[in-house]
Amino acid sequence: MTTNYSLVNFHLSAMIEMLMRKYSLSYENALPLVMSSNTYKTLLDRPYLQEEGSLFVCELLEKELQKEDVRSKR
Protein backbone atom coordinates (compact mmCIF):
# COMPACT_ATOMS: atom_id res chain seq x y z
CA MET A 1 0.00 0.00 0.00
CA THR A 2 1.40 3.41 -0.94
CA THR A 3 0.83 6.85 0.47
CA ASN A 4 -2.33 8.45 -0.86
CA TYR A 5 -1.54 12.15 -0.74
CA SER A 6 -5.14 13.06 -1.46
CA LEU A 7 -6.17 11.40 1.83
CA VAL A 8 -3.19 12.90 3.65
CA ASN A 9 -4.25 16.38 2.51
CA PHE A 10 -7.83 15.68 3.59
CA HIS A 11 -6.68 14.65 7.08
CA LEU A 12 -4.25 17.58 7.25
CA SER A 13 -7.09 20.01 6.56
CA ALA A 14 -9.32 18.30 9.13
CA MET A 15 -6.62 18.45 11.83
CA ILE A 16 -5.92 22.13 11.15
CA GLU A 17 -9.62 22.98 11.21
CA MET A 18 -10.07 21.09 14.49
CA LEU A 19 -7.26 23.07 16.12
CA MET A 20 -8.60 26.36 14.80
CA ARG A 21 -12.12 25.69 16.09
CA LYS A 22 -11.39 23.94 19.36
CA TYR A 23 -8.39 25.96 20.52
CA SER A 24 -9.00 29.24 18.64
CA LEU A 25 -5.66 28.96 16.88
CA SER A 26 -4.95 30.89 13.72
CA TYR A 27 -4.15 28.97 10.55
CA GLU A 28 -0.56 30.24 10.76
CA ASN A 29 -0.19 28.67 14.22
CA ALA A 30 -2.14 25.48 13.56
CA LEU A 31 -0.29 24.47 10.39
CA PRO A 32 3.22 24.14 11.86
CA LEU A 33 1.79 22.48 14.96
CA VAL A 34 0.16 19.77 12.84
CA MET A 35 3.12 19.42 10.46
CA SER A 36 5.52 18.81 13.35
CA SER A 37 3.24 16.35 15.15
CA ASN A 38 3.91 12.63 15.43
CA THR A 39 0.35 12.04 14.22
CA TYR A 40 1.13 13.69 10.88
CA LYS A 41 4.42 11.80 10.55
CA THR A 42 2.65 8.52 11.29
CA LEU A 43 -0.02 9.39 8.74
CA LEU A 44 2.69 9.72 6.08
CA ASP A 45 4.53 6.54 7.10
CA ARG A 46 1.58 4.19 7.63
CA PRO A 47 -0.87 4.12 4.73
CA TYR A 48 -3.41 2.05 6.70
CA LEU A 49 -3.95 5.08 8.94
CA GLN A 50 -4.92 7.12 5.87
CA GLU A 51 -7.97 4.91 5.45
CA GLU A 52 -9.26 5.83 8.92
CA GLY A 53 -11.83 8.58 9.32
CA SER A 54 -10.71 12.11 10.03
CA LEU A 55 -12.40 12.00 13.45
CA PHE A 56 -10.09 9.14 14.49
CA VAL A 57 -7.00 10.96 13.17
CA CYS A 58 -8.03 14.20 14.92
CA GLU A 59 -8.48 12.29 18.18
CA LEU A 60 -4.95 10.90 17.83
CA LEU A 61 -3.62 14.43 17.35
CA GLU A 62 -5.61 15.73 20.29
CA LYS A 63 -4.28 12.99 22.59
CA GLU A 64 -0.76 13.84 21.47
CA LEU A 65 -1.28 17.55 22.13
CA GLN A 66 -2.84 17.00 25.57
CA LYS A 67 0.69 16.48 26.85
CA GLU A 68 1.42 20.13 26.10
CA ASP A 69 -0.63 23.28 26.42
CA VAL A 70 -1.94 23.94 22.91
CA ARG A 71 -3.25 27.36 23.90
CA SER A 72 0.31 28.53 24.51
CA LYS A 73 0.94 28.09 20.76
CA ARG A 74 -1.36 31.01 19.87
Where are these regions (language model features)?
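C-terminal alpha-helical interaction appendages
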Residues: M1-R74
